[in-house]
From Swiss-Prot:
Primary role: Hydrolyzes N-terminal residues in D-amino acid-containing peptides.
EC number: 3.4.11.19
Gene name of the record: dap
Protein name, UniProt field: D-aminopeptidase
Catalysed transformations (reactions): Release of an N-terminal D-amino acid from a peptide, Xaa-|-Yaa-, in which Xaa is preferably D-Ala, D-Ser or D-Thr. D-amino acid amides and methyl esters also are hydrolyzed, as is glycine amide
GO BP, sorted A to Z: proteolysis
Keyword Lyase included in the entry's annotation: no
Length: 520
C-alpha cells in the first residue's frame, strides 16, 4: 500500500453531492481502527428539513445478512447443525435439497423469493407479512441449479436462516442480534425493525433530478435478509469491533470472512453473508444493501486494516462511492480500459437454451455495449473484435454463438443468436404448478401484455416484447424489493404439431420456472 493520503479522500468526499445527486448521505473511512473521515451531508427528510447526521439511522438493507450469519455462528454453531431442520422446512422438495451452508453462501440454487413474489401477483407497494414469506418459501420443490455448484443471490436463503435460528434457540432474532452482536460491538442504536413501514426517523427517496425525489413506500416485513436500521456511527463501531478482534481466531468476523468454495473446489465469491472482492491485489470483504429509496455499502480490507462505509437515503451509487473510497485509501491507481469499436454483429438477443436466460446487447458508443442479463444493465468494454467484458461478465463471440462466463458465479453459458420473428400465437392462460400461480397473456390491438396472478394478488398488465422465435421479454421495473427482477424471459415450448404446450419464465434471480398452457 502506498502512503495513506487523507487529503485525496477529503477531496473526493467533497465531490459526492455533485456526482451522486440526491437528498443526503453519510460516509466514513477507518484506518487501524481509528476514524480518519466521518461526514454527512444533505437532509434526512426534505419536507421537514431534518438534516442528515452521522447519528441518523437508516435501513442498512442486505448488509443485515452478515449479522444474521454472525448470530448463527454465535448462538447455534456451524451451519451444519441446522441441516436436519432445513430438510423439515423444505419438506416438499422433489430433488436434492441445499444445505444450510449453501444458504449462507448463496449457493442454494433456490430462486429469489422477492422475484417470485412478482410471479405470485404481489403489489410492489403492498404489505408482505412473515406468514406470506413462509408460505412462499415452503411451497418450493426445485432449485434452478444443483446446490453448491454456482452462485446466485437469494434473499430467501437468509429469511429461512432466521426462521431456523429462532426455532433452534427459542428466541427472537431481534433479541439475539441485540445481545450477541450489537451490544458487544458497541452499536448503540442499531436495531432490527422487521416492519419497514414503522421506521420513520429518516425518509428514503425514489427518483432523480429530472423526475424529482419522492418518498419511497416500503411495507415489507423483513427478517434475516434485511431489516436492520443503524446509523453511520453504529457502522463505524462495527468496523472498530472488527479491527479490535482481528487477531482472535475465534472472533466472529474472522469466522464470517473465511474463504468458501463451490462443490468442485473453485473459490467462491460469497460466504456467510459477506461478498468477497479484490482491488489493488488486496482482498476485501463487505456487502451492499438496496431497498426502494435506500442504498448502503461497507468494505473492509483486513491486510491494511482499512474500512469504508457509504449510506444514502436515495437510489444512488453508494457501492461505487465505498469502492472508490477504498481505492483512494489503498492508493490504487485508476486506469482506462483500452477499447475497440463494437461491430454491429454483436447487437441483438442471445439465448442459453439450458437456463432460458437471454443476453441482450446494444451499442453504447466509444467501444462499449449495454448488456442486459442480470438484474440491471451493465456496461461492457469491447476489448477485441470478438471479446467484451464488464466487471462481472466476459463474453466471446464465435459467429452466431456467444460464450458467456461469470467467473465469480462459477457460471459458463453457450448462447445462440436469436434470428427471425416470433409467432403471434402466445395469448393464453398458463399455470405454474410449483408456485400455484398463473400468467395470463392477452393480445390487445396487436400488442401483447402479461399479468401475474397468485396467492399474493393480481398484478398490473405488463408489456411483452419479442426477442426472437418463441422468446419474449417482459420487463418489470418495480417490485417489492430493489433492484427489481428486470426482464423476465419467456421461452415457449411447442409439440410436434407446432402448438404451444407451455413455457419457462425466468430471470437471473429466478430461472427456469415451468408453466403449462391451460386449454380453455
Amino acid at each position: 500500500m502506498s502512503k495513506f493520503d487523507l487529503s485525496a479522500l477529503e477531496t473526493f468526499v467533497r465531490t459526492i453531492p455533485q456526482h451522486y445527486k440526491g437528498p443526503g448521505g453519510a460516509v466514513a473511512v477507518l484506518k487501524d481502527g481509528k476514524v480518519v473521515l466521518r461526514h454527512a451531508w444533505g437532509f434526512a427528510d426534505l419536507s421537514t428539513r431534518k438534516a442528515m447526521t452521522p447519528e441518523t439511522r437508516m435501513p442498512i438493507c442486505s448488509v443485515s445478512k452478515q449479522f444474521t450469519c454472525a448470530v448463527l455462528l454465535d448462538s447455534v454453531g456451524e451451519p451444519e447443525v441446522l441441516d436436519d431442520a432445513l430438510a423439515a422446512y423444505l419438506d416438499k422438495f422433489a430433488e436434492k435439497r441445499p444445505s444450510v451452508r449453501d444458504l449462507c453462501n448463496n449457493q442454494s440454487g433456490l430462486r429469489d423469493y422477492w422475484a417470485l413474489t412478482v410471479l405470485c401477483g404481489a403489489d410492489p407497494e403492498g404489505v408482505f407479512l412473515p406468514e406470506q414469506a413462509q408460505s412462499l418459501l415452503r411451497r418450493l420443490k426445485t432449485t434452478h441449479f444443483a446446490p453448491g455448484t454456482h452462485y446466485s443471490y437469494c434473499n430467501g436463503n437468509f429469511r429461512i436462516l432466521a426462521d431456523l435460528i429462532e426455532q433452534h434457540t427459542g428466541r427472537s432474532l431481534i433479541e439475539l442480534l441485540s445481545e450477541r452482536i450489537f451490544q458487544p460491538a458497541g452499536m448503540k442504536t442499531a436495531e432490527l425493525i422487521p416492519d419497514t413501514a414503522l421506521f420513520d426517523e429518516c425518509t428514503g427517496y425514489e427518483g432523480d433530478t429530472v423526475r424529482g425525489f419522492l418518498p419511497a413506500v416500503n411495507r415489507i416485513h423483513w427478517m434475516g435478509d434485511a431489516g436492520i436500521c443503524a446509523s453511520l456511527d453504529d457502522m463505524i463501531a462495527w468496523e472498530q469491533f472488527i479491527d479490535a478482534t482481528r487477531d482472535d481466531e475465534s472472533g466472529i468476523y474472522r469466522r464470517l470472512s473465511g474463504l468458501q468454495t463451490f462443490s468442485d473446489g473453485a473459490a467462491a465469491p460469497y460466504g456467510l453473508g459477506l461478498k468477497f472482492e479484490e482491488t489493488g491485489g488486496k482482498r476485501l470483504t463487505g456487502h451492499g444493501g438496496a431497498l426502494r429509496g435506500w442504498r448502503c455499502q461497507r468494505w473492509h480490507c483486513a491486510d491494511e486494516r482499512l474500512s469504508t462505509i457509504a449510506m444514502f437515503n436515495f437510489e444512488g451509487g453508494a457501492s461505487d462511492v465505498a469502492f472508490k473510497l477504498m481505492n483512494i485509501a489503498l492508493g490504487v491507481p485508476t486506469s482506462e480500459q483500452v477499447r475497440v469499436a463494437a461491430d454491429a454483429v454483436w447487437f441483438g438477443s442471445w439465448l442459453d437454451h439450458e437456463t432460458g436466460l437471454v443476453l441482450s446487447l446494444e451499442d453504447a458508443g466509444r467501444g462499449r455495449m449495454k448488456a442486459r442479463f442480470g438484474t440491471g444493465p451493465e456496461m461492457m468494454d469491447v476489448v477485441g473484435e470478438n471479446e467484451a467484458r464488464s466487471s462481472m461478465t466476459a463474453i466471446r463471440r464465435d459467429g452466431d454463438t456467444i460464450h458467456l462466463a461469470r467467473e465469480d458465479e462459477n457460471l459458463s453459458l453457450t448462447m445462440q443468436r436469436l434470428k427471425g420473428a416470433a409467432k403471434q400465437d402466445i395469448a393464453g392462460h398458463y399455470r405454474s404448478d410449483e408456485l400455484e400461480a398463473d400468467l395470463l397473456i392477452v393480445d390487445e390491438g396487436g400488442a401483447f401484455y402479461g399479468a401475474f396472478e397468485g396467492f399474493l394478488g393480481k398484478s398490473d398488465m405488463y408489456s411483452l416484447y419479442e426477442a426472437g422465435p418463441d422468446v419474449w421479454l417482459l420487463p418489470v421495473q418495480r417490485s417489492m424489493d430493489a433492484p427489481s427482477p428486470g426482464e423476465w424471459k419467456l421461452v415457449f415450448h411447442r409439440d410436434a404439431k407446432g402448438e404451444i404446450t407451455g413455457m419457462t419464465v425466468g430471470c437471473w434471480l429466478a430461472r427456469h420456472v415451468d408453466y403449462r398452457r391451460i386449454q380453455e
